[in-house]
């Protein structure tokens, strides 16, 4: 998703690299700072929903700091991954995690022609779903060429022959 595609799809004006620095409930406004320019401005709201986000889980595993490994949580993370793919043209990717974000990334990487494997500790994708729904998702992913390694854990990463082995 880009801010433009998010707006065209949902009519939501997404501001990337901006931070809310103050909330003014009496005026129904927030103070926003552009992290690239330092400019601050006021933005009004009807209802304010606080969604501070989360940091992706990144376990302490051997090799986790390799430059060919990425976490995906923000639009900026997407840009980093896209830039890497455009510059290096990898043929395959292993995704650790089979939730909403992992499945969406798998779909996008397959559309780019990459071989994709999802490694997931639980024995099903989309853990919150029941087994029947998960089974449908498994079949769809396999039908579209995504390999599934369910019930497996990632133990670490090792750089080899210009790529990364997932242990």
Predicted regions and their residues:
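Residues that line or immediately flank small-molecule/substrate-binding pockets and catalytic motifs
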Residues: 52, 97, 161
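Rossmann-like NAD(P)H-binding beta-loop-alpha module
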Residues: 80-129
């Amino acid at each position: 998703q880009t801010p433009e595609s998010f707006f065209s799809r949902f009519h939501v004006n997404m501001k990337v690299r901006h931070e809310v620095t103050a909330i003014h409930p009496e005026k129904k406004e927030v103070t926003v700072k552009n992290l690239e320019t330092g400019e601050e401005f006021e933005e009004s709201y009807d209802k304010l929903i606080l969604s501070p986000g989360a940091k992706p889980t990144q376990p302490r595993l051997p090799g986790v700091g390799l430059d060919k490994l990425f976490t995906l949580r923000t639009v900026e993370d997407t840009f980093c991954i896209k830039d890497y793919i455009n510059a290096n043209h990898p043929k395959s990717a292993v995704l650790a995690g089979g939730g909403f974000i992992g499945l969406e990334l798998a779909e996008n990487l397959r559309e780019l022609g990459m071989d994709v494997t999802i490694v997931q500790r639980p024995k099903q994708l989309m853990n919150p779903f029941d087994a029947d729904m998960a089974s449908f998702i498994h079949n769809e992913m396999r039908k579209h060429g995504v390999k599934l390694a369910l019930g497996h854990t990632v133990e670490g990463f090792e750089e080899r022959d210009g790529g990364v082995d997932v242990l």
